Amino acid sequence: MCSYVAKTLNVSLAEAYKFQKSYFREYGTSLKGLMENHKIDPFDYLDYVHEIDLSIIEKDEKLGSALTKLPGRKIVFTNAATPYAKKVLKKLGIANHFEAIFDIVDANFIPKPEPKVYQQIVAKYNISCETTTMVEDILKNLGPAAEMGMTTVWVNTNKPWSKNNSDGILPDVVIEDLSSWLLGVANA
């Protein structure tokens, strides 16, 4: 990502890193900041940053088993692009568990946690907020879901970026192991 920013803005990698982190914090995604401040082509950016080695991702049998047992609809809501999300889901061996992917392109490049994006996904898929659970690894992205009446689950990865700009957001559930939690819910 930093190499794209450095090349596109003609700055050093160190300067590109500062831009990338600043835009991520301010706009929710680096992409949105680059679009707002530098008028970059979002498709060019997405093609570049999602062309990464996914060999470290392994099939997750436990997660697949949990999703199989879990009733209800499952929709991916991501600030990434659908082709990338599909690659990750396929590597994990769980692609068949999801009926749809709502990505940054569907959202007109407006990232989570912008409330209107949550309204878009709810309308597009006729989601009942009162019976929906949103699982997320970035805490601030749960704020709008909670305000709409969804149950919120934060997967605490213990990464500093996962808590940025999240003051006052209290998820219903905090977990560290998604597969175990889902199995517990499915077996309850």
Q: What function would you assign to each model-found segment?
A:
Residues 17-19, 50-54, 72, 104-105, ...:
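Short, contiguous strand/loop micro-motifs
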Residues 5-7, 46-49, 73-75, 105-106, ...:
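N-terminal start-of-chain detector that recognizes signal peptides
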Residues 68, 81-188:
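Asp-based, Mg2+/Mn2+-dependent phosphohydrolase catalytic module
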Residues 62-74:
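A short, Lys/Arg-enriched amphipathic alpha-helix followed by its capping loop at the start of a domain
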Residues 6, 24, 35, 53, ...:
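Short, flexible active-site loop motifs that bind/organize anionic cofactors or intermediates
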Residues 11, 40, 72, 127, ...:
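Short glycine/serine/threonine/alanine-rich loop segments
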Residues 1-64, 83:
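N-terminal helical cap/lid subdomain that shapes the substrate entry/recognition surface
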